[in-house]
A protein has these predicted regions:
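Aromatic (tryptophan-biased) beta-strands that constitute blades/sheets of beta-rich domains
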Residues: 19-28, 45, 49-93, 117-161, ...
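Repeated scaffold domains used in trafficking and secretory/extracellular systems
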Residues: 69, 142-157, 185-200, 233-249, ...
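Internal/C-terminal transmembrane anchor helices
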Residues: 99-129
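Long, acidic/polar, low-complexity amphipathic helices and coiled-coil-like
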Residues: 154-309
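Structural motif
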Residues: 165-169, 207-218, 260-264, 304-314, ...
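Short loop/turn segments that connect beta-strands within beta-propeller blades
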Residues: 173-175, 221-224, 267-271, 317-320, ...
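Acidic, serine/threonine- and glycine-rich low-complexity intrinsically disordered segments
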Residues: 264, 275-428, 437
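Blade-level signature of beta-propeller repeat domains, shared across WD40, Kelch, NHL, RCC1
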Residues: 481-520
Length: 520
């Protein structure tokens, strides 16, 4: 029986069966070609990332295991798997659809699959290699080549001042633009600087021909770069360029050292003398620090006392110059190095020359009583928190890889004989016990304060990485950020910026790297 369209029921059923038999292979071919397109896109994407990690992030072209740039080995394996999957699915699509699918349809399905797979493929790749930061701006290397960097100050949230032997240079931390520069006075060079800049004022020690470092002291306004005052400073006859003048400041008082043993308090903004106080006989000042209304000085005494102590911590009132207290440092002999790591709370590092002396970090109460001593060489690990520039000439500001946060002293530590420490530990200021410890796979280049309650740790092996740690627990806040395209000198400082990035200041004296740069 024929229907209105002229076909019988048998003919209609036969045509329907043919349609179903054709649609199945056609749909399978379209899906196979679309998946093949996605896999080819992923293979190219992961292959390019593998080449980038191998060529750019691994200059020696060889690595093994955890030494390899993060994500490199998985990227290479996945690129091969995706490439193989592409060939399998492309052949499957051609076999399934046969001649039913025109070339244009196959190409369209292939292209749609490739485009649809780009975004999820990129998200997976980004997770695999982890977060990255790129250089937002940089300031070129120091010129002239004779200039040597000594240290830096922060002036508010938007200005960093880099101190060199030939002068001071201020930069806007948002774009890296130069704000001002101040050349060293005629026939003089800068040779020392205060570790902190109070009330927008920095102190520098000057060296003139035939006179040692610290023969003059000057104050600089960090908003304008103007020298506020300059003062000749009397030094001992045997002073050398390594007897760095102590320069420190509270909010209203500048403190300098005369003749290696006399503290002089000056008006921070006008340089007028307000007080002076002599150290005990046969004692000289080897380190200076200040905070609030107190000045702290490390004394080294040549005449051995009745109790055998030769090194002391001396506290002086910053307003009147009166001596508050004097407490012995546990070195039991000559001191090879001493630094005031924190003036509030009081944390002092002192290393003894004699093997029977104690080298460690000493914590004092506000009244000068010794609270605890954290040994440099402990039963489980060694503190490894100082980094100095090398070579002759004036001494640069040491970069301390240690942070005092709340009631914790946090330091880079080394529990092996390797030259590259890989651990960070926190010790309680109350009793010196270790509160937490964390270990990294790569060597640690810098530990510094981060954002509120955080620490910043920079590590490197094949590439540079930045980590964020919770200062209270040592917990890592996130996966490490890979620093792309950065040029770090052997000695540098790092601090967070307001826009969520980080500012790096290179401080090595013989460096061709950028003077400073920001990443975001």
């Amino acid at each position: 029986m024929r229907r209105a369209d002229g076909r019988t029921d048998e003919e209609r059923e036969r045509h329907a069966t043919i349609g179903f038999r054709t649609a199945g292979p056609l749909l399978a071919g379209l899906v196979a070609f679309a998946l093949a397109g996605a896999l080819l896109g992923w293979a190219v994407m992961y292959g390019v990332m593998f080449l980038k990690l191998m060529i750019v992030d691994m200059p020696s072209y060889q690595c093994g295991g955890s030494d390899c740039p993060r994500g490199m080995m998985p990227a290479s394996l996945l690129a091969a798997v995706f490439g193989g999957g592409f060939f399998v699915l492309a052949r499957l699509g051609a076999h399934s659809s046969g001649k039913l699918l025109p070339v244009g349809g196959a190409c369209g399905a292939f292209l749609c699959g490739a485009l649809a797979g780009l975004w999820p493929g990129w998200l997976a790749l980004a997770w695999l290699v982890g977060p990255h930061m790129d250089v937002a701006w940089e300031v070129g290397p120091d010129r002239p080549s004779s200039a040597r960097v000594l240290g830096y100050w922060e002036s508010g949230p938007a200005t960093v001042v880099r101190v060199r032997t030939d002068g001071l240079y201020a930069y806007n931390t948002a774009q890296g633009d130069a704000r001002w520069s101040a050349s060293a006075p005629d026939r003089a060079r800068v040779c020392a600087l205060s570790r902190t800049a109070r009330s927008g004022t920095g102190l520098v020690g000057l060296e003139r021909q035939g006179a040692p470092c610290g023969s003059s002291v000057a104050a600089v306004d960090l908003e304008s770069g103007r020298f506020l005052w300059q003062r000749d400073n009397a030094l001992a006859e045997n002073a050398t360029g390594y007897d760095i003048t102590g320069v420190a400041s509270t909010h209203a008082t500048a403190v300098v050292v005369e003749k290696l043993g006399t503290l002089v308090g000056l008006g921070l903004r006008d340089g007028s003398e307000r007080w002076r106080v002599d150290a005990p006989p046969d004692c000289g000042v080897s380190a200076l620090g200040a905070s609030g209304d107190r000045v702290l000085a490390v004394l080294e005494c040549s005449g051995e006392s009745s109790t055998g102590e030769t090194a002391w911590l001396w506290a002086v009132d910053a307003t009147s110059g009166s001596s508050d207290w004097r407490s012995p440092l546990p070195t039991s002999g000559p001191v090879s190095a001493a630094h005031i790591l924190s003036a509030d709370p009081i944390v002092v590092y002192a290393a003894g020359q004699d093997p029977w002396g104690t080298s460690g970090v000493t914590v004092f109460d506000a009244d000068g009583s010794r609270r605890t001593v954290i040994p440099i060489a402990g039963p489980d690990e060694d503190l490894a928190f100082t980094a100095f520039t090398e070579g002759p000439g004036p001494q640069s500001m040491p970069a301390f890889q240690a942070v005092v946060s709340g009631e914790l002293f946090i330091s880079v530590v080394n529990d092996t004989k390797s030259d590259r420490p890989r651990g960070v530990s926190a010790y309680a200021l109350a009793d010196g016990r270790r509160v937490w410890h964390t270990t990294f796979d790569d060597g640690i280049d810098m530990l510094a304060p981060g954002r509120d309650g955080e620490l910043t740790v920079v590590t490197s092996r094949w590439f540079d990485q930045l980590w964020r740690l919770d200062a209270r627990s040592g917990t890592r806040e996130q996966k490490a950020v890979v620093l792309d395209g950065v040029s770090l000198s052997p000695l540098f400082a790092v601090r967070p910026t307001a826009n969520g990035g980080y500012l790096f200041v290179n401080l090595h004296e013989d460096s061709d790297e950028a003077a400073l740069f920001a990443v975001d």
